[in-house]
Curated annotation (Swiss-Prot):
Gene3D superfamilies in the cross-refs: Immunoglobulins
Tissue: Detected at the sperm head, equatorial region, neck and midpiece (at protein level). Expressed in testis.
Highest rank taxon of the organism: Eukaryota
Record's function text: Sperm protein required for fusion of sperm with the egg membrane during fertilization. May regulate the expression of sperm surface protein DCST2.
Keyword Acetylation: no
Upper classification of the organism: Eukaryota, Metazoa, Chordata, Craniata, Vertebrata
Protein known as: Sperm acrosome membrane-associated protein 6
Side of membrane Extracellular, spans: 27-295
C-alpha cells in the first residue's frame, strides 16, 4: 500500500515541477499534493486572482531549504501527519484573512524544527548486508535507499587442529529485524575457499545461527556459508573457510598404530593356511612337542598297535591251523 501511495504521489510531484519550475523536489512535494497546495493558495488570494501564481511560487520557495532533506524511513508516516496538520493550519489562516507571505515562511520554519526532532536513521555499518534499519527517505526524489553494500560478507578464516571442534557464528554487526528471521547453511568441500554459490550444497541438519563441527576431519576442509533471511528475503551471506591442520589426537594415533600392527601380522591369504600336523619323527625330534598330552597319545597309539599286531597274529595262526 505504501508503494501504491508513493507511486500515486509521483505524477503530482512531476506536475508541481512543471508548474512551479523548481530545480529539485522538496519534502513539501513528497507529502502534499498539487491540488492541496493549489487549494490553499486559492483560499489565500481567491479562485481567479492574478496573485495565484505568485502565491504558488512563494509556497514552494519557502520550503526550498528542505529539498535535500533525508529522514529515517520509519519516520515517513510521522512526517506525513505533520504536513497534513500544516495544511489544515494554513487553511485556517487563509480563512482568517491571513497573509501567505507570512504564513508560508512560518510554516516552513516549524517544519524544519519537526524534522530535526525526528529519530535519525542508523548509520551504515560495513562491510556487508541489507540493513533495513539504516534505510533513508530522500526528499530530493521522494524515494528511499539502503546502504550501498554487497550482500556477501568477506570470507572468514577458521583454523582448527584435526580432531578438535570447529564453531561458526552466523552473526552480523548490524541490527536485524525481530520477526521471521531464518538461517540456512551450505558447504563447499574439497578445500575450496570460494563465494561462488554454484559450488555449495545444502546442509539440511544445520539450523540456527550457530554451527559446530566435531571432531573436525580433513574431509571438512572447505567453505561453510550461512544465509540470513527475513521472510525468504536474503539479508546477508556469511562465509567461513575451515582449514584443518596438524596430526590427529594422541589417542587416535595409538589406535591407528595398533591397527597397522595387526594388519602387518595378519595372513594375506587366509584360505591357503593349513593346520600343522606333525609326523612321529617331527614329534620325537622337537622336545617342545612332547607335552604330557602328546606323550599320552603316543602311549595309547603304541598300545593299540601292539594289540592289533597280537590279534592279527592269532587270526593268522587259527587260519593256518584250520587249513591243515
Amino acid at each position: 500500500m505504501a508503494l501504491l501511495a508513493l507511486a500515486s504521489a509521483v505524477p503530482s510531484a512531476l506536475l508541481a515541477l512543471a508548474v512551479f519550475r523548481v530545480p529539485a523536489w522538496a519534502c513539501l512535494l513528497c507529502f502534499t499534493t498539487y491540488s492541496e497546495r493549489l487549494r490553499i493558495c486559492q483560499m489565500f488570494v481567491g479562485m481567479r486572482s492574478p496573485k495565484l501564481e505568485e502565491c504558488e511560487e512563494a509556497f514552494t520557495a519557502a520550503f526550498q531549504g528542505l529539498s535535500d532533506t533525508e529522514i529515517n524511513y520509519d519516520e515517513r508516516s510521522h512526517l506525513h501527519d505533520t504536513f497534513t496538520q500544516m495544511t489544515h493550519a494554513l487553511q485556517e489562516l487563509a480563512a482568517a484573512q491571513g497573509s501567505f507571505e507570512v504564513a508560508f515562511p512560518d510554516a516552513a520554519e516549524k517544519m524544519k524544527k519537526v524534522i530535526t526532532q525526528l529519530k535519525e536513521a542508523q548509520a551504515c555499518i560495513p562491510p556487508c548486508g541489507l540493513q533495513e534499519f539504516a534505510r533513508r527517505f530522500l526528499c530530493s526524489g521522494c524515494y528511499s535507499r539502503v546502504c550501498d553494500l554487497p550482500l556477501d560478507c568477506p570470507v572468514q578464516d577458521v583454523t582448527v587442529t584435526r580432531g578438535d571442534q570447529a564453531m561458526f557464528s552466523c552473526i552480523v554487526n548490524f541490527q536485524l529485524p525481530k520477526e521471521e528471521i531464518t538461517y540456512s547453511w551450505k558447504f563447499a568441500g574439497g578445500g575450496l575457499r570460494t563465494q561462488d554459490l554454484s559450488y555449495f550444497r545444502d546442509m539440511p541438519r544445520a539450523e540456527g545461527y550457530l554451527a559446530r563441527i566435531r571432531p573436525a576431519q580433513l574431509t571438512h576442509r572447505g567453505t561453510f556459508s550461512c544465509v540470513i533471511k527475513q521472510d525468504q528475503r536474503p539479508l546477508a551471506r556469511l562465509y567461513f573457510f575451515l582449514n584443518v591442520t596438524g596430526p590427529p589426537p594422541r589417542a587416535e594415533t595409538e589406535l591407528q598404530a595398533s591397527f597397522r600392527e595387526v594388519l602387518r601380522w595378519a595372513p594375506r591369504d587366509a584360505e591357503l593356511i593349513e593346520p600343522w600336523r606333525p609326523s612321529l619323527g617331527e614329534l620325537l625330534a622337537r622336545p617342545e612337542a612332547l607335552t604330557p598330552s602328546n606323550l599320552f597319545l603316543l602311549a595309547v597309539l603304541g598300545a593299540l598297535a601292539s594289540a592289533s599286531a597280537t590279534v592279527l597274529a592269532w587270526m593268522f595262526f587259527r587260519w593256518y591251523c584250520s587249513g591243515n
